[in-house]
């Protein structure tokens, strides 16, 4: 075969024959390639058709199996659905019961909260009233404490005046040369509260333990009234001052006064000396009238026990009456 495109070439018969040969070879190879492609396409189509038929058969088998199984399990499915319905109904009933219980508990909680609110208000009112009562009682206690302090100072002053009057009576009687009025120390001595701390005694320890506060902000104050009722006050109050320092002299002053005073205080003259004898006159041992405090004297080994007398003598109509007591008391 010759192509019409090569009709224009007139170089020579060799070139034309070579071109024709090349074209024929190319055409032959193209035909072979096309035939190969056609065969491959046919084989591919054949394989696809066989695969489609296999899948169709498998699908048919699965459909048959599903139909058979569904027909067999129809009865079991109805029983299971009924059981599930019953179970659901039971759970719903339990849920309703729990909801009712929850509602009841909420109501009870509201009631409890209301009661708590009422009780809190009541407690606040009572606490306010109680605090007001405590303030009033604390004020009253403060007034009583100040009155007690005034009375203690008055007692100390009256005691000093009483002993001054007694010294004047003793000096005017002239019954003895060793009268204590002759001593300038006794004449100028007046009871005064001690500047230093008094020695610790069981009585002071008991007072301190009773007046000690149980809390830094509150202290317990027990007071018994005329009706023997115990009142408990819990409010910061000042402790009642101890009147003992106003009634007792210091130990250092006692030691100093012992050196200045005579060891024997003679009895005071009385109009009734002829009627009865005083134990102080009958016994020549060392006797001492306490001036609101204790003064201890050194006694000889053979001396009899001292007679302790009351701290304050009674002056009635210019006569001195001395009272004896078994114990030493302070005014």
Swiss-Prot record:
The modification Phosphoserine is found at residue 209. InterPro entries: CCDC74A/CCDC74B/CCDC92, CCDC92/74_N. Its main location: cytoplasm. It comes from Homo sapiens (Human). Residues 193-203 have a biased composition (Basic and acidic residues). Residues 171-184 have a biased composition (Low complexity). Residues 18-44, 76-152 form a coiled coil. This is Coiled-coil domain-containing protein 92. Interferon-stimulated protein that plays a role in innate immunity. Strongly inhibits ebolavirus transcription and replication. Forms a complex with viral RNA-bound nucleocapsid NP and thereby prevents the transport of NP to the cell surface. Keywords: Antiviral protein, Coiled coil, Cytoplasm, Cytoskeleton, Host-virus interaction, Immunity, Innate immunity, Phosphoprotein. Residues 171-212 are annotated as: Disordered. Phosphorylated at Ser-209 by TTBK2. Induction: Up to threefold after interferon treatment. GO terms for cellular component: centriole; centrosome; cytoplasm; intracellular membrane-bounded organelle; nucleoplasm. GO terms for biological process: innate immune response; regulation of defense response to virus. The lineage of its organism: Eukaryota, Metazoa, Chordata, Craniata, Vertebrata.
């Amino acid at each position: 075969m010759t192509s019409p495109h090569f009709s224009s070439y007139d170089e020579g018969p060799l070139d034309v024959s070579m071109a024709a040969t090349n074209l024929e070879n190319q055409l032959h190879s193209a035909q072979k390639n096309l035939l190969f492609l056609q065969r491959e396409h046919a084989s591919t189509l054949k394989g696809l058709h066989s695969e489609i038929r296999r899948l169709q058969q498998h699908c048919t088998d699965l459909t048959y199996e599903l139909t058979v199984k569904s027909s067999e399990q129809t009865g079991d499915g109805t029983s299971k659905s009924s059981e599930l319905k019953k179970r659901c109904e039971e759970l719903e009933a339990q849920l309703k019961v729990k909801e009712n219980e929850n509602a009841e508990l909420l109501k009870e909680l509201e009631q409890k909260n209301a009661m708590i609110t009422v009780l809190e208000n009541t407690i606040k009112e009572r606490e306010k009233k109680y605090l007001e009562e405590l303030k009033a009682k604390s004020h009253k206690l403060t007034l009583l404490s100040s009155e007690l302090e005034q009375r203690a100072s008055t007692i100390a002053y009256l005691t000093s005046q009483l002993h001054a009057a007694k010294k004047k009576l003793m000096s005017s009687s002239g019954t003895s040369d060793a009268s204590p009025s002759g001593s300038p120390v006794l004449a100028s001595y007046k009871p005064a509260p001690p500047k230093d701390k008094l020695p610790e005694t069981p009585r002071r320890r008991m007072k301190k333990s009773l007046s000690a506060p149980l809390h830094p902000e509150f202290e317990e104050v027990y007071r018994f009234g005329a009706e023997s009722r115990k009142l408990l006050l819990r409010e910061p109050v000042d402790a009642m001052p101890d009147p003992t320092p106003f009634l007792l002299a210091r130990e250092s002053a006692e030691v100093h006064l012992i050196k200045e005073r005579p060891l024997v205080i003679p009895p005071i003259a009385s109009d009734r000396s002829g009627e009865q004898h005083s134990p102080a006159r009958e016994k020549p041992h060392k006797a001492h009238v306490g001036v609101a405090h204790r003064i201890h004297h050194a006694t000889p080994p053979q001396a009899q026990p001292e007679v302790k007398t009351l701290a304050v003598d009674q002056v009635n109509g210019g006569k001195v009456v001395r009272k004896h007591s078994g114990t030493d008391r302070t005014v």
